[in-house]
């Protein structure tokens, strides 16, 4: 027998009716519109009471226990916003979150009668609550307790189910400036800019022997192909894997590798969509992927997923990476992984040495390597001269440790989880 978690709408209505939280209030006698303070956490004038509604929901939902858990303002705000955004009876009427004097948002019930939802009994779970309520509670708990590991589900359909609306969303929390950092703007936000291209280091191995390495900027993404021609009509810059006959001496192995390359067809496509890296196979041979160390893939266990055919699949999410990087700097975990490994034409080497596989390809997003290096060295200003972020059109980076942390936290609030 446990305590039932409150539902967001009845709980929020009760908070509005009480009027005890600073800035949280009904607008007008009809009580269909209300305002929520929405001050950025890095503003110099930010006070604890500015985030009262977010903390109160974190406590009520069981995501935060005062005195036990570490306060996490960005996560509280994201969870609260996500809970509201999932409600079809609510809409964001006005966004004044960039107002320098009074940052806030105004929400509106699209059905005037919905605000009369009764507050559920939260004393003892008597097992008689509505099935839909149970599903809602379970979903919200899964979302709040989710382990945001970098390896997202391989069957994510990014293009149709999760478009990168967070890039220039009107509901974005990030202001034009990066407060408390002494910077006029956050240079790390270039990572999400539509017009910016990431630089990738691509390395290919045939039976464990490195046969190819190239560092490229690829507008529209890249495609690993096995022939010179490929299909020029497909998007992404084709990167041809080398003829195995030029580097392998075993003829039987050479023949097998050539067979795999011939089945690549249109290639293995990899591109960035906002905070995601997406992949799709355009040929017949299966491709499995996993996040691992730069020096070797994560063998000994199953792959993180299989690259889907004829649709997009998410293979890397920048959001959890940034969150884990912040936690690493705080000393609470190891540095996050960022290297993508692909096993082409064969099953993932979970029970065998990876060097036994015919074709393995490693892809390193150079900007993520730089971010981890900065964290390990205690700030970009601690490295020699300035740091290249390895993004097209980006300026050299030089940040103190405090500036770097502030920019990471600022960037994290721009993420969609």
From Swiss-Prot:
Family of this protein: Belongs to the IRF family.
Subunit (UniProt): Monomer. Homodimer; phosphorylation-induced. Interacts (when phosphorylated) with CREBBP. Interacts with MAVS (via phosphorylated pLxIS motif). Interacts with TICAM1 (via phosphorylated pLxIS motif). Interacts with STING1 (via phosphorylated pLxIS motif). Interacts with IKBKE and TBK1. Interacts with TICAM2. Interacts with RBCK1. Interacts with HERC5. Interacts with DDX3X; the interaction allows the phosphorylation and activation of IRF3 by IKBKE. Interacts with TRIM21 and ULK1, in the presence of TRIM21; this interaction leads to IRF3 degradation by autophagy.
UniProt keyword annotations, A-Z: Acetylation, Activator, Antiviral defense, Cytoplasm, Disulfide bond, DNA-binding, Immunity, Innate immunity, Isopeptide bond, Mitochondrion, Nucleus, Phosphoprotein, Transcription, Transcription regulation, Ubl conjugation
Magnesium as UniProt keyword: no
Region (Mediates interaction with ZDHHC11): 140-417
Cross-link (Glycyl lysine isopeptide (Lys-Gly) (interchain with G-Cter in ISG15)): 189, 356, 362
Marked site (Cleavage) residue numbers: 121-122
Any single Gene Ontology cellular-component annotation: nucleus
Modified residues (Phosphoserine): 14, 97, 123, 184, 381-382, 392, 394
The name this protein goes by in its record: Interferon regulatory factor 3
Paired cysteines (S-S): 263-285
Highest rank taxon of the organism: Eukaryota
DNA-binding annotation, residue ranges on this chain: 5-111
Region (Interaction with HERC5): 196-356
InterPro entries: Interferon_reg_fact_DNA-bd_dom, Interferon_reg_factor-3, SMAD-like_dom_sf, SMAD_FHA_dom_sf, WH-like_DNA-bd_sf, WH_DNA-bd_sf
GN (gene name): IRF3
GO molecular function: DNA-binding transcription factor activity, RNA polymerase II-specific; RNA polymerase II cis-regulatory region sequence-specific DNA binding
Lineage: Eukaryota, Metazoa, Chordata, Craniata, Vertebrata
DNA-binding keyword on record: yes
Regulation: In the absence of viral infection, maintained as a monomer in an autoinhibited state. Phosphorylation by TBK1 and IKBKE disrupts this autoinhibition leading to the liberation of the DNA-binding and dimerization activities and its nuclear localization where it can activate type I IFN and ISG genes. Phosphorylation and activation follow the following steps: innate adapter proteins, such as MAVS, STING1 or TICAM1, are first activated by viral RNA, cytosolic DNA and bacterial lipopolysaccharide (LPS), respectively, leading to activation of the kinases TBK1 and IKBKE.
Subcellular compartments: Cytoplasm; Nucleus; Mitochondrion
Organism: Bos taurus
Function as written in the Swiss-Prot or TrEMBL entry: Key transcriptional regulator of type I interferon (IFN)-dependent immune responses which plays a critical role in the innate immune response against DNA and RNA viruses. Regulates the transcription of type I IFN genes (IFN-alpha and IFN-beta) and IFN-stimulated genes (ISG) by binding to an interferon-stimulated response element (ISRE) in their promoters. Acts as a more potent activator of the IFN-beta (IFNB) gene than the IFN-alpha (IFNA) gene and plays a critical role in both the early and late phases of the IFNA/B gene induction.
Modifications made to the protein after synthesis: Constitutively phosphorylated on many Ser/Thr residues. Activated following phosphorylation by TBK1 and IKBKE. Innate adapter proteins, such as MAVS, STING1 or TICAM1, are first activated by viral RNA, cytosolic DNA, and bacterial lipopolysaccharide (LPS), respectively, leading to activation of the kinases TBK1 and IKBKE. These kinases then phosphorylate the adapter proteins on the pLxIS motif, leading to recruitment of IRF3, thereby licensing IRF3 for phosphorylation by TBK1. Pyrophosphorylated by UAP1 following phosphorylation at Ser-382 by TBK1. Pyrophosphorylation promotes subsequent phosphorylation at Ser-392, leading to homodimerization of IRF3.
């Amino acid at each position: 027998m446990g305590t039932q978690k409150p539902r967001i709408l009845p709980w929020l209505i009760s908070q509005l009716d009480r009027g005890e939280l600073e800035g949280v209030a009904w607008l007008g006698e009809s009580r269909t519109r209300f305002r929520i303070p929405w001050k950025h956490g890095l503003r110099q004038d930010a006070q604890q009471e500015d985030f009262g509604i977010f903390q109160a929901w974190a406590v009520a939902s069981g995501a935060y226990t005062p005195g036990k858990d570490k306060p996490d303002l960005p996560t509280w705000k994201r969870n609260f916003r996500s809970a509201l955004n999932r409600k079809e009876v609510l809409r964001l009427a006005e966004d004044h979150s960039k107002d320098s004097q009074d940052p806030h948002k105004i929400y509106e019930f699209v059905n005037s009668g919905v605000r009369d939802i009764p507050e559920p009994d939260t004393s003892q779970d008597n097992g008689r609550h509505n099935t839909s309520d149970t599903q809602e509670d379970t979903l919200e708990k899964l979302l709040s307790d989710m382990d945001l590991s970098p390896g997202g589900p391989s069957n994510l359909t990014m293009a149709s189910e999760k478009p990168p609306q967070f890039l220039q969303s009107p509901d974005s929390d990030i202001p034009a400036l990066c407060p408390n950092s002494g910077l006029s703007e956050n240079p790390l936000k270039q990572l999400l800019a539509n017009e910016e291209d990431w630089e990738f280091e691509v390395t290919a191995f045939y039976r464990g022997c490195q046969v190819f390495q190239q560092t490229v900027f690829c507008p529209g993404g890249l495609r690993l192909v096995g022939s010179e021609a490929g299909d020029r009509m497909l998007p992404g810059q084709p990167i041809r894997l080398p003829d195995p006959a030029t580097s392998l001496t075993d003829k039987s192995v050479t023949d097998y590798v050539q067979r795999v390359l011939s089945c690549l067809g249109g290639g293995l496509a990899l591109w960035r969509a906002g905070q995601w890296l997406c992949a799709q196979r355009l040929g017949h041979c299966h491709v499995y992927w996993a996040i691992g160390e730069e020096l070797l893939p994560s063998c000994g266990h199953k792959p993180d997923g299989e690259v889907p055919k004829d649709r997009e699949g998410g293979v890397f999410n920048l959001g959890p990476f940034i969150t884990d990087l912040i936690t690493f700097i705080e000393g609470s975990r190891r540095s996050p992984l960022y290297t993508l490994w692909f096993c082409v034409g064969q099953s993932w080497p979970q029970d065998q040495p990876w060097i036994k596989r015919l074709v393995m390809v490693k892809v390193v997003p150079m900007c993520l390597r730089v971010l981890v290096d900065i964290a390990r060295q205690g700030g970009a200003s601690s490295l020699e001269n300035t740091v290249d972020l390895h993004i097209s059109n980006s300026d050299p980076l030089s940040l103190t440790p405090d500036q770097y942390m502030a920019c990471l936290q600022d960037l994290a609030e721009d993420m969609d989880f």
